[in-house]
Amino acid sequence: MEEFGISPGQLVAVFWDKSSPEEALKKLVARLQELTGSEGQVFMENVTQLLQSSHKESSFDVILSGVVPGSTSLHSAEVLAEMARILRPGGCLFLKEPVETAEVNNDKMKTASKLCSALTLSGLVEIKELQREALSPEEVQSVQEHLGYHSDSLRSVRVTGKKPNFEVGSSSQLKLPNKKSSSVKPVVDPAAAKLWTLSANDMEDDSVDLIDSDELLDPEDLKRPDPASLKAPSCGEGKKRKACKNCTCGLAEELEREQSKAQSSQPKSACGNCYLGDAFRCANCPYLGMPAFKPGEQVLLSNSNLQDA
């Protein structure tokens, strides 16, 4: 028990599973209760119920899992992450698990290195392998019965990890050194400053060539362009004039004006019954002979209809 570093007043959690011998579990818990004393507490739970228990964050000082003699517990990534969550900052986790030493492809058994990597990914630090030994005959039988795994290259590994002295997501103010502003002005090279200085006397010097901005433009550049020349070459080409989607040459507005002008020139019904059909139309109705249409529907009349009307 000394390797667990348990002291009086601590809260210790012991996780077991169906492979843990009952008598060995009772003996372990009794010894832990002696170490924690009356001010401490030893909590026991089946590891398969850990994810459903909803323990409070940072609840235990020490967590022991799979350390019951004869136990062959396996720990998933979710279980390890939950153990790290309920462990207090600075608390320690001790677990024992059978691992595979041969190079085999399986998802059931982890190697010792993969087990340490899983502990690191769960948020623990200072991961150490404390012990590696061969499985006892009882543990080999337990692996075959409870895990359904057969291998001669299994070893029992005991590892430990520590939770950092801060919670995940916590923030801390950084103490940055105060940079004192210097009152001493930087030294300026006189030769360099002279290169960037242009006095009034230099402006009157005949050797200084100044460019007149007006001379940069030709007379052709100052002429206003013809609006027709600004239209895109392909805009409105063909028999049917059609403006581009993002027309900027004015063709869209021109077509809209032509359309509104054509609509205003169309004759309007005086009686309001033209859309019902010939039975309801006047003798001089321009829509005679045309089928009925919906109210408000646009109907274009040919020149012959207009002349007959």
From Swiss-Prot:
Entry-linked InterPro entries: Anamorsin (IPR007785), Anamorsin_N_metazoan (IPR049011), CIAPIN1 (IPR046408), SAM-dependent_MTases_sf (IPR029063)
GO function terms (MF aspect): 2 iron, 2 sulfur cluster binding; 4 iron, 4 sulfur cluster binding; electron transfer activity; metal ion binding
Residues at which [2Fe-2S] cluster binds: C235, C244, C247, C249
Main location: cytoplasm
Gene3D superfamilies: Vaccinia Virus protein VP39
GO cellular component, as recorded: cytoplasm; mitochondrial intermembrane space; nucleolus; nucleoplasm
Localization per Swiss-Prot or TrEMBL: Cytoplasm; Nucleus; Mitochondrion intermembrane space
Residue(s) carrying Phosphoserine: S182, S183, S213, S269, S302, S304
Placement of sequence motif Cx2C motif 2: 282-285
Region named Linker: 173-222
Induction of synthesis: By cytokines such as IL3 and THPO.
Keyword entries, A-Z: 2Fe-2S, 4Fe-4S, Apoptosis, Cytoplasm, Iron, Iron-sulfur, Metal-binding, Mitochondrion, Nucleus, Phosphoprotein
Motif (Cx2C motif 1): 271-274
Phenotype upon gene inactivation: Death in late gestation due to defective definitive hematopoiesis in the fetal liver, possibly due to initiated apoptosis in erythroid cells during terminal maturation.
Renumbered residue ranges of the record's region Fe-S binding site B: 271-285
Xref: PANTHER family: ANAMORSIN (PTHR13273:SF14)
Other remarks on this protein: 'Ana-mors-in' means 'anti-death molecule' in Latin.
Subunit structure: Monomer. Interacts with NDOR1. Interacts with CHCHD4.
Name under which the protein is recorded: Anamorsin
Native source organism of the sequence: Mus musculus (Mouse)
Lineage: Eukaryota, Metazoa, Chordata, Craniata, Vertebrata
